[in-house]
């Protein structure tokens, strides 16, 4: 809903900018954005995504695997396959962060990525592990050092609760909204080598 709201807000309040980008940056941008606002977002597990990729009559640069992340080429194929945005949920626990809640199957975590046509991954999130003992065991399994993150462990030690979080790639959203195809052209604060004096 948030993404749809933001895109609709931009379409309603920045028509000149969208028309400019539609004409000079990405032909069909306005339709792409309108289609996303009207789209039903598919929700599907990582395992089922890999099933689709393995059955595809496609030669992949990076072979799809149930134990790995999906590549940019896979994201592109999946958004075309479903003709719109896709929430990929229940990721393999071994490729995700230690603080993500492990699902009852003990193979996946309660994590989700949102991929959109052309741009790929736009958002990622997960339910966090609220149980200190489970979190410590997971850190040990993944060889995560406790040094420097005692404050984080204290949030579980002194009254943690069930919670989730997500992050959105701001620059990727701006790319999607404007049709600009290089992330360096949309970053608000340029990051150039040897240009940040301390």
Segment roles from a protein language model:
Residues 37, 123, 127:
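Conserved aromatic-histidine-acidic binding/catalytic patches
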Residues 126-127, 131-198:
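Active-site pocket scaffolds in enzymes
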Residues 114-124:
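C-terminal substrate/ligand-recognition segments
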Residues 1-116, 141-161:
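Metal-assisted phosphate- and nucleotidyl-transfer catalytic regions
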